[in-house]
Design a protein with these regions (language model features):
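Aromatic- and charge-enriched surface segment that lines or borders ligand/interaction sites
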Residues: 89-133, 149-156, 250-256, 307-311, ...
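Extracytoplasmic/peripheral linker and loop segments enriched in polar/acidic and small residues
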Residues: 313-316, 328, 363, 432-447, ...
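Long beta-strand-rich cores associated with HINT superfamily self-processing modules
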Residues: 543-578
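N-terminal lobe/hinge region of extracytoplasmic solute-binding protein
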Residues: 39-95, 126, 205-206
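Surface-exposed binding/hinge segments that line
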Residues: 137-189, 546
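Structural transition elements
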Residues: 337-389, 394-395, 414-421, 509, ...
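Ligand-site clamp/hinge motif
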Residues: 198, 226-272, 427, 436-438, ...
Length: 578
C-alpha cells in the first residue's frame, strides 16, 4: 500500500494537534456563511509580515499578497491572449515592442478611498527599477524612467518586450516611497521601501478586495475592503487562513468542511475527500507548470566541495537516470504526469517543443547506460561503490580534485508529502546506480529561506508555468544578478542563455523567429541541464460547494484555479451563495 495512503488514513483516524489548534478559530468562519476559509501552503510559520516583495513574509509564503495588492491585468494562464481588466484597463505595445502603455482603471482605489493614480504606478516601476531587492517580478531594466500622463503609464525599455506582456501586466501594485497617498505622509509604514522590511497587517494599505485585519500565529483573518469598486460587491465578506503543519492536516480540515478551498496536494483525494461527499467536494488539477529537480551550481551549496553538480555531464546523467513514471504514479498518485521533453515545456506549451519532443525514457536509464555515460565522461566507481571524479577532464568540469566522491542531497519540506516521497524515490534510484544522493527534510519556512540564500544542493520545485515558453525559461535561466535573486535559485549562469532570453523577449509568440529562439533555449536545457524536468505540476485546487459556488472548473476556465496565484481575488469576487 502506498505510504501516502497510509499517512492519509492515519490523519483521518485521529484529528492531529495542528487541526485541533485551529479548529476552534475557524468555527466562526463556518458559522458565518460569507466568510471563506482557505490555505495554499502547509508548515509555514506565521509571522506578522505582509510585505509583498519579501520572500520570507507570510503574505508571500502563503500566497496572500494578491488579496490586498492587485496586478495591473488579470491574465488567464489557462487561455492564451485572454485577460481581465483590473488595476489597468489595457496594456498596449508600440510597433517595436519597446514602449508599453497601461491605462489605469478609474475604479481602482486604495483602501482609504483615494484613487490609484498613474503617477503612483509609474513611481512603483521606477522604484523597483532601481532597487533589485524589490523587483521580484523580473521587470527588465527601463531605458528611461517610467512616466505618467493623465491616466496612462508609459514604460520604455532598451529592447522589445513582447514576450514579457503577461509578466509586466502581472506586477502587483503597492504603495512605495514618493506616492503621496492622502492621509499617509512620507515615512508612513504603509510605504514599502525594501524587500526585507516588515509590514504588519495593521499597516497594509491595499487596493484589493480584502485587508488582513486579524493576525495570530494560528489564524490570519481578512475582511472586505469598503472601497473595493472594480467588481460588484463580493458575496465573500471575509477570508480566514489557518495554519496547518502538513498536507494531511489540510485533508482532515477539507473533509470536515473546516476548509472551503485548498491549494496543496491532498493525499488520496478521491478516497478521503471526494468519496465523503461527491455532490459537494471537488478538485481540479490542470497541469500548470513543470516541476523540476533544481540543481544548485553555485559555490554556496552545502556540498559544493563534493557534489559534482558543476559538471553538465554529471547533471545529465542524474536527469536521465530518474524514473519519471514512478514519481508520477506513486509520489503524485497519478495527478501529475511525467515530463516528456528535456525542454521543460508544459502540455500547454507543447507546440514549442520542436526537436525535443518526447525525448525522455520515462522509466529512466538502466544502470548499464548510466555507467557507460559517466565512465565516458571521466567518472569511475570508487571503493565505496559510488561514482567519483576519475580524470582531469572531469576534474576541470566539476572544479573538484580527482578521486572526489560525488555526493549531494535533495532538500524539500517534510510537510510536502508528495515532494518528500518523490525525493526518496529519486535517491533510491540514483543510489542503485551508484550515485550517492541523499535527502534532507526541513520545515517549509527554512526551505524558503534556503532557496533564496542558495543553501541547498538540489530541490524539487515547481516552475513558472504560463502559456508563453519565455516565462518558464526566464525562471530557470535568467542570471539572478538581473532579477535581484528572485528567480534562478540554482544560480546558473550562461551568457548564451542571457542573449537568447533577450532575443526571445523581443519576438512575437508563434512566429518562426520565436520558435528558433525557443529551440536554442531548449538546447541549453537539454545539454546543460540547469534543472531536470520531472513532472507536469498540477495546480492543486480542492474545494467544496457546501457554501460557495462559481469556482473555476474544466468547463469554466475564467481564471487559473487554486488560491496560490494572482487570480485569487478574481475568483473570490466571482463566488456566490450555493
Amino acid at each position: 500500500m502506498n505510504k501516502k495512503f497510509l499517512a492519509s488514513l492515519m490523519a483521518l483516524s485521529s484529528i492531529s494537534l495542528g487541526v485541533v489548534a485551529v479548529s476552534t478559530q475557524v468555527t466562526g468562519a463556518i458559522s458565518s456563511p460569507t466568510i471563506l476559509t482557505e490555505e495554499t501552503n502547509v508548515g509555514v510559520t506565521f509571522t506578522n509580515n505582509f510585505n509583498p516583495v519579501d520572500s520570507q513574509s507570510v503574505g508571500t509564503q502563503m500566497s496572500l499578497n494578491a488579496l490586498s495588492y492587485e496586478p495591473l491585468i488579470q491574465y488567464n494562464a489557462m487561455k492564451p491572449n485572454v485577460w481581465t481588466p483590473w488595476i489597468a484597463t489595457n496594456e498596449v505595445f508600440n510597433a517595436t515592442g519597446q514602449v508599453v502603455t497601461f491605462t489605469i482603471n478609474p475604479k481602482a482605489e486604495w483602501s482609504n478611498g483615494s484613487p490609484v493614480t498613474a503617477a503612483q504606478v509609474a513611481n512603483e516601476f521606477n522604484v523597483i527599477n532601481t532597487n533589485a531587492g524589490m523587483n521580484v517580478f523580473g521587470v527588465p531594466t527601463l531605458a528611461t524612467p517610467a512616466t505618467a500622463s493623465g491616466n496612462k503609464v508609459t514604460l520604455t525599455f532598451p529592447t522589445p518586450q513582447f514576450a514579457n506582456q503577461d509578466a509586466l501586466g502581472s506586477v502587483l501594485i503597492f504603495p512605495v516611497a514618493g506616492d503621496n497617498i492622502p492621509g499617509y505622509p512620507a515615512g508612513s509604514p504603509v510605504y514599502i521601501t525594501a524587500g526585507t522590511s516588515t509590514l504588519t497587517n495593521n499597516d497594509v494599505l491595499g487596493n484589493g478586495p480584502y485587508l488582513p485585519t486579524g493576525y495570530n500565529t494560528q489564524l490570519i483573518s481578512y475582511t472586505a475592503s469598503p472601497h473595493w469598486k472594480m467588481t460588484a460587491k463580493p458575496y465573500v465578506t471575509g477570508v480566514h487562513v489557518p495554519y496547518y503543519a502538513a498536507n494531511q492536516d489540510a485533508t482532515q480540515a477539507l473533509v470536515t468542511h473546516q476548509l472551503d478551498w485548498a491549494g496543496n496536494d491532498i493525499p488520496q483525494i478521491k478516497q478521503v475527500f471526494i468519496a465523503s461527499n461527491p455532490a459537494q467536494n471537488h478538485f481540479y488539477y490542470p497541469a500548470g507548470s513543470t516541476v523540476t529537480l533544481w540543481f544548485n551550481v553555485s559555490s554556496s551549496a552545502p556540498d559544493g566541495n563534493r557534489d559534482c553538480l558543476a559538471d553538465p555531464y554529471f547533471r545529465y546523467a542524474v536527469s536521465m537516470a530518474i524514473d519519471r513514471n514512478q514519481l508520477s504514479q506513486i509520489g503524485e498518485t497519478g495527478f501529475e504526469q511525467p515530463a516528456t521533453s528535456t525542454s521543460g515545456m508544459t502540455p500547454a506549451q507543447a507546440a514549442y517543443e520542436g526537436p525535443y519532443k518526447n525525448n525522455y525514457n520515462l522509466n529512466g536509464w538502466t544502470y548499464a547506460q548510466v555507467t557507460k555515460y559517466l565512465k565516458d565522461h571521466g567518472f569511475a566507481v570508487d571503493s565505496n561503490s559510488y561514482f567519483a571524479v576519475n580524470t582531469a577532464t572531469a576534474a576541470a568540469q566539476t572544479h573538484l580534485s580527482i578521486n572526489t566522491e560525488c555526493q549531494f542531497s535533495i532538500q524539500d519540506p517534510t510537510g510536502y508529502s508528495d515532494y518528500a516521497e518523490d525525493e526518496q524515490m529519486i535517491s533510491a534510484t540514483l543510489q542503485g546506480d551508484h550515485i550517492n544522493v541523499n535527502t534532507v527534510g526541513v520545515t517549509t519556512g527554512q526551505w524558503n529561506a534556503n532557496i533564496f540564500t542558495h543553501n541547498f544542493d538540489a530541490m524539487i520545485h515547481w516552475g513558472a508555468g504560463g502559456t508563453n515558453p519565455y516565462s518558464q525559461f526566464e525562471n530557470w535561466l535568467d542570471d539572478p544578478a538581473n532579477t535581484g535573486g528572485s528567480t534562478n535559485y540554482g544560480a546558473y549562469q550562461n551568457s548564451a542563455a542571457q542573449a537568447d532570453l533577450v532575443a526571445l523577449s523581443g519576438l512575437r509568440q508563434g512566429t518562426p523567429a520565436f520558435q528558433a529562439e525557443v529551440n536554442k533555449l531548449s538546447a541549453i536545457m537539454t545539454n546543460d541541464v540547469p534543472v531536470a524536468p520531472l513532472l507536469y505540476g498540477a495546480d492543486w485546487d480542492a474545494y467544496t460547494t457546501a457554501r460557495f459556488t462559481g469556482w473555476v472548473t474544466p468547463t469554466n476556465q475564467y481564471a487559473y484555479p487554486g488560491p496560490g496565484t494572482n487570480d485569487v481575488a478574481l475568483i473570490l469576487t466571482k463566488l456566490t451563495k450555493s
